[in-house]
Every structure is written in C-alpha cells, then in structure tokens.
Amino acid sequence: MKTIILALALIVLASSTQADVIATIKKIDQSPFGRTLFDTIWLELQTGDPLDRLLQTLTDLEDRYVAEQKEDDARNHEYQDACTVDIKAFDKDLAESNRKKIELEARLEGQLYPQRGILQGLVAQKQAEVKGYQKDLDELDAQRAEEKADFEEKVLEHQEATAIIAEARRLFADNIEHESFIQKGKATKQPAHKFTKEVASMIQKHFTTSAKKAAKFQHRKGYSKLFKAFATIASKVEQLADAGAVSKIIDLADELLAKIADSLSLLRFAEDKRVEAYKKSRNFIVISLTVAGTALANAQSDLAALNDVIAQVEASLDTTNQRIENVSADRNDRFTQCEEAVQDYQDARSARSSDRDVVSQTIGLVNKELRTLREQLALRQSAGEEI
C-alpha cells in the first residue's frame, strides 16, 4: 500500500514539475530575445548537430552579460561619484552665494539705506536753512533798498525846500530899495524902501509854483501849506512896504533854512545808523548762510558718495542673485542628467538581467529538459509559431 502511495506521489510530482517547465518555456518564448534563442535551438535540433557548441555559446553569452554588468556597474559608480562631486560643488557655490546675498542685503537694509535716509533728511534740513537764510538776506536787502530810496526822497525834498526858501529869501533881500537919509533942518527921515508889484508878483509866482511842487512830496507835504502862506504874503504888496516886516520874513526864511539843515542832519544821522545796523545784520546772515551752505555741500557730497556705495552693493547683489539663478539652473540640469543616468542604468541592468535569466533558464532547459523543450518547440512550429 505504501508503495502505491509513493508511486502516486512521484507521478503527481513529475506532472507538477513538467507543468512548471512548460510554463517556463512559454514565458521565455514570449520575449523577443527568448524567441530568437528558441528559433536558434530549433534549427540546431533540426540539423541534428550536437548542442555542445550552442551550449558553449549560451554559456559565453551568460558570462558576457555578467562581465558587461560589472563594467556597467563600475561606469555607473564612477559616473554617480562624479555626479556627487558636481552636485556638492554646486551646493557649495549656492551656499556661498546665498551667504554673500544675506550679507549684502543686511548691509543695505541694516546700514546703507538707513544712512541714506539720515543724509537725505540732513540735506533737506540744510536746504531749508539755506533757503531761509537766503530769504532773510533778500528781505533785508529789499528793506535796505526801500529805506535808501525813502531816505533819498527825503533828502531830495529837504534840498528842494532849501532851494525854494533860499531863492525866496534872495528875492526878498535883493529887491529892497533903500533911499538915502534926507535931512531937512533937524528933522530926520527913516530909511524908506520900495517893494514893487512886479517883485511881489514874481515872489508870489515862485511860492505858488513851489507849493504845487511840494504838494507832490511823499514825506514833507507841510511845505506846500508853508509855501502857500508865503505866496499869500507876497500878494499883499502894501504889507511889504514895511522894511521891518520884510526883515522878519527874511529872518523867518533863515530860521526855516536852519531847521531844514538840522532836520537833514538828523535824517543823515538816522540813515547812517540804519546802514550800520543793516551791515551788521547782513554780515550775520551771510555768515549763517555760508555755514549752512558749507554744511549742505558736505551733506550732498556725503550723500553722493553713499549713493555710489549703494549702487555698487546693489550691483553686487544683482550679480549674486543672477549667479544663484544660473548655478541653480546648472545644478538642476546636472541633477536631472544624473537621475536620468541612474534610470538608464537601472533599465539596462534590468534588461540585461532579464536576458541573462533567459539565457540561464535556456541553458537549464537544454541540459535538463531537452525532451520537453523539443516537444514544445515542435508544437509551436506545428501551431504556427506559437506554443
């Protein structure tokens, strides 16, 4: 009974093993390379030649696959080592560039830009000071010019009034005609004079014209009334017949001339004081303007120099950013190449491993399962090239 069971077990095992062999044959035949091998084996079987040479060829092919894989492994290892070196070099370059970028940005944001803001504020402040001092200077000069013009007008009015009164005095004094003393017995006559209507008319006209002229004065308009009063006096010839009255008029003219001279002296004294004060004020403003102008020029020079430094640092930052962009692109390209090489290597290794497995399995079939292989190949031929 045990013998029967053992025999059945062996039969089942043999059937299972043969099914596995057939499955292996069909699997190999599904690949182009396996089909080519089977075609070659079938031809050898048809000729009846020994399969030793074919087995040797397959063995050599298997050995060549192993050798090629070792060479490919070595090349891949060398290439990937080069990739590692290149990627590390790119990473080092990027790290250095990023470090430099951070330093440049920190210098700009933490130092140069704040300094520029301070200098710009200082320049604006000094510009305002210069503008203010220049405005003060212009206003002071304008005020001085106005005061000078006002002074000159007053001087001219004094001079014109002096000329008018002096001329009137001359007319009064020069046109008095004295007569000789006439003694009749013990009787004595007082000196007499004549003040003609022509002279009175001339003096009246002189004062009337002068009054109109004085009415246009900007400062001493009172002269116009004075001259009108003199014109009125000159019109009364009968009053001028008295030499004493004329003398009083002359004395009044002398008094007026003296007062005008005193007024003019005071006017000139006040003008001298104003000029002195103007020169002091102007000198102070000019000094302040010069100091502010120098400070402005220095601040502008410092700002221009700082702007040059900022431009250089910004240019360096632009160059660094461009380098980071270029190196990053080169690194990505190199990384892609290395990854593609890895994939190509793995694909080639997988294909070579698959072909080597086919060769190994085929050698095993020829050595151990030649009868089954022959039958399956014959079936494939009879079935139209398909097992």
UniProtKB/Swiss-Prot annotation:
Residues 51-163, 294-333 form a coiled coil. Two components are produced by post-translational processing from the precursor peptide. One of its GO terms (cellular component) is trichocyst. Residues 20-48, 184-239 form a propeptide. Keywords: Coiled coil, Signal. Residues 1-19 form the signal peptide. It is found in: Trichocyst. Its main location: other. Belongs to the TMP family. Structural protein that crystallize inside the trichocyst matrix. This is Trichocyst matrix protein T2-C.
